[in-house]
UniProtKB/Swiss-Prot annotation:
InterPro entries: Dup_hybrid_motif, Glu_permease_IIB, PTrfase_EIIB_Cys, PTS_EIIA_1_perm, PTS_EIIC, PTS_EIIC_1, PTS_IIB_1, PTS_IIBC_sucr
PANTHER family: PHOSPHOTRANSFERASE SYSTEM TRANSPORT PROTEIN, PTS SYSTEM TREHALOSE-SPECIFIC EIIBC COMPONENT
Protein name according to UniProt: PTS system sucrose-specific EIIBCA component
Membrane topology per record: Multi-pass membrane protein
Keyword Cell membrane: yes
Domain notes: The PTS EIIB type-1 domain is phosphorylated by phospho-EIIA on a cysteinyl residue. Then, it transfers the phosphoryl group to the sugar substrate concomitantly with the sugar uptake processed by the PTS EIIC type-1 domain.
Reaction it catalyzes: N(pros)-phospho-L-histidyl-[protein](out) + sucrose = sucrose 6(G)-phosphate(in) + L-histidyl-[protein]
Gene: scrA
NCBIfam families: EIIB_glc, PTBA, PTS-II-BC-sucr
Annotated keywords: Cell membrane, Kinase, Membrane, Phosphotransferase system, Sugar transport, Transferase, Transmembrane, Transmembrane helix, Transport
TM helices/strands, residue ranges: 109-129, 158-178, 187-207, 211-231, 239-259, 271-291, 310-330, 354-374, 411-433, 453-473
Function: The phosphoenolpyruvate-dependent sugar phosphotransferase system (sugar PTS), a major carbohydrate active transport system, catalyzes the phosphorylation of incoming sugar substrates concomitantly with their translocation across the cell membrane. This system is involved in sucrose transport.
Domain PTS EIIC type-1, residue spans: 108-492
Length: 664
């Protein structure tokens, strides 16, 4: 890569006079611009050395890749005369140019709290779907499977119990996550959640030791009253509730910080938890619980009223608006609302989650429009992007399709809205609802009410068919000049570059051989496409896997050479003896910690053996900084291989386990 040339091209594209400040992390340039609209996006999209771009938190980020980004950055500093700044300083510069938006702040808060507990709700919801499958009449004749095969009734009852638990004890889950977000002790947050469900639990235990969870012990159920200093306080149980526990734990965090600052260390350990919990507990049952329960009920009932009143027309409008909402980030607040809808369904007071159904229709429509672009465009880079992001959208992750393809051409985005609106309206007419959270796409049928699954599948197919047909038809008739110009450019490029590209490709592939890459750290393996960073989830840096660490040490996954060892200790670039170029990136946006909590054990150009220690990190410090410690394990020269396969896409992995396999 010609670093000076790439830097010059980036500067030209964003505008030299438009640049305010620049920093870089392990993979990308981070720029603060005066006006994002002045960027020549087409020039950057056409640049083979630029792997992608996106905007977040007031920063315009240009993906270059490990081992190259620091040299490109140096050239940008040299050519512009800007002062070098850290990523943390860049955040402050970006923030200073933005006005505080309370709505966006609330959305981010809700997202931070609810995203970590979604797996528990997904598990509970899917178990509920399984129980519905076993107990619903009409799916397999006039009788349910349990009625036809009584021997499975015990298993069905146990599944029902397990499915109800995450929702019944939802305040405990929310209490833990909210405490972490508000900076309180997570176990105290859990305690507040337990206190809020305790009256209902005590009621059930008192009724019968082996009785199933009854609807009597649902939202607002109570066993009597307390006389608190003359006040008649209801012994209410806040099972299935979200808003009351959020406010209660927020108060807990304020009290805990207050007492930590003012109590002597000799008594702080004992009295801070005691005073924080007892004050929060009393205020929860006397004030917070009753008031916030009413607010929660108004919110849920209002949404249900809107659904009941507008019917399929309202669903159609929502289907058209969902993707534009995703562009603004407002959809991050939906899990909190959906949790309430699902909880209401669980306790028999609601219809179910129609937001999930609408989201699924919208995601599939955007994916279909992206696939239409695959067949319309002659641009090889766009073909690759549209195929990968199209699959991603069909599985529920639409950002790569939206920002990388559909919004670039504009018309696919609007054509997809026609498909999503039509399918959502039909789903509303058929009263298709979800009973759990999950993947809002083709796999979303796992979250749908059992009796509605066939209708859901039909609606998904309708969404795909309409969006694909309208996009392809418009592209062939109205946007033909756009793709003709692309084809001409692509042919000219191929004529100039065909021979050197073939030679380079042959040389690169000759230098790599098949090999298996070992897990560099212990933890839980998760799909790379699910991580909360578009640079990695879009696979712009290459294919790989992510790990939620259970330890604090990073080990060499192969025999090879350290190409990059960042001073911040948060990322390592390695080239194996067999040619695989590997990036290990500890955490998301952890470059902003500037090395705090990280210790680097190797240097650039150092030879390493599989199992050698590369460095250590402190997950607690990463959490204290409000960051995610999910670690990316990526093959950055993916293009040199015929395939990069994950050998363990989920579940627990140990250091040294076979994790990725690369084949020529």
């Amino acid at each position: 890569m010609d670093y000076s040339k790439v830097a010059s091209e980036v500067i030209t594209a964003v505008g030299k006079d438009n640049l305010v400040a620049a920093a870089h992390c392990a993979t990308r340039l981070r720029l603060v611009l005066k006006d994002d609209s002045k960027v020549d996006q087409k020039a950057l999209d056409k640049n083979a050395d630029v792997k992608g771009t996106f905007k977040t938190d007031g920063q315009y980020q240009v993906i270059i890749g490990p081992g190259d980004v620091n040299f490109v950055y140096d050239e940008i500093i040299k050519q512009t005369g800007l002062t070098e700044v850290s990523t943390d300083d860049l955040k402050k510069i970006a923030a200073s140019g933005k006005k505080f938006n309370p709505i966006m702040a609330l959305i981010k808060l809700l997202s931070d709290i609810f995203v970590p507990i979604i797996p528990a709700l997904v598990a509970g919801g899917l178990l509920m779907a399984l129980n519905n499958f076993l107990t619903s009449e009409g799916l397999f004749g006039t009788k349910s499977l349990v009625q036809q095969f009584p021997i499975i009734k015990g298993s069905s009852d146990m599944i029902q119990l397990m499915s109800a638990a995450p929702f019944w004890f939802l305040p405990i889950l929310v209490g833990i996550s909210a405490a972490k977000r508000f900076g309180a002790n997570q176990f105290l947050g859990a305690s507040i959640g337990m206190i809020m469900v305790a009256p209902g639990a005590a009621n059930i235990i008192g009724l019968a030791a082996n009785a199933p969870i009854s609807k009597a012990a649902t939202i607002g159920a109570y066993t009597g009253f307390w006389n608190i200093f003359g006040l008649h306080v209801t012994q209410a149980s806040y099972t299935y509730q979200v808003i009351p526990v959020l406010v209660a734990v927020w108060l807990l965090s304020i009290l805990e910080k207050f007492f930590h600052k003012r109590l002597p260390s000799a008594v702080d350990f004992t009295f801070t938890p005691l005073l924080s919990v007892i004050i929060t507990g009393f205020l929860t049952f006397i004030v917070i619980g009753p008031v916030m329960k009413e607010v929660s009920d108004w919110l849920t009932n209002g949404i249900v009223w809107l659904y009941d009143t507008t019917g399929f027309l309202g669903m159609g409008v929502f289907g058209a608006l969902y993707s534009p909402v995703v562009m603004t980030g407002l959809h991050q607040s939906f899990p909190a609302i959906e949790t309430q809808l699902i909880s209401a369904f669980q306790n028999g007071t609601g219809h179910g989650d129609f937001i999930f159904v609408t989201a699924s229709m919208a995601n599939v429509a955007q994916g279909a429009a992206t696939f239409a672009i695959y067949f319309l465009t002659k641009d090889k880079k766009m073909k690759g992007l549209s195929s990968s992001s199209g699959v991603s959208a069909l599985l529920g992750i639409t950002e790569p399709a939206l920002f990388g393809v559909n919004l670039k051409y504009r018309f696919p985005f609007f054509c997809a809205l026609i498909g999503s609106a039509s399918a959502a309206a039909i789903a509303g007419l058929l009263q298709v609802v979800a009973v759990s959270l999950g993947s809002a796409g083709f796999l979303g049928f796992l979250s749908i009410k059992a009796s509605s699954i066939p209708f859901y599948v039909v609606c998904e197919l309708i969404s795909f068919a309409i969006a694909f047909a309208v996009t392809y038809g418009y592209g062939k008739t109205k946007a033909v000049d756009v793709f003709a110009a692309e084809a001409a450019v692509e042919e000219a490029i191929e004529e100039v570059q065909e021979i050197p590209e073939e030679a380079a490709s042959a040389a690169n592939k000759a230098q790599v051989t098949d090999e298996v890459l070992a897990a560099p750290l212990a933890g839980e393996a998760v799909e790379l496409t699910s991580v909360n960073d578009p640079v990695f989830s879009s696979e712009a840096m290459g294919k790989g896997i992510a790990i939620k660490p259970s330890g604090n040490t990073v080990y060499a996954p192969v025999d090879g050479t350290v190409q990059i060892a960042f001073d911040t200790g948060h990322a390592y670039g390695i080239k194996s003896d067999n040619g695989a170029e590997i990036l290990i990136h500890i955490g998301i946006d952890t470059v902003s910690m500037e090395g705090k909590g990280f210790e680097q054990k190797v240097q650039a150009d150092q030879k390493i053996k599989k199992g050698d220690v590369l460095g250590t990190f402190d997950s607690d410090k990463i959490a204290e900084a409000g960051l995610d410690n999910t670690t990316m394990f990526i093959v950055t020269n993916t293009a040199d291989y015929a395939s990069v396969e994950t050998l363990a896409s989920s579940g627990t992995v140990a250091v040294g386990d076979s994790l990725l396999e690369v084949k020529k």
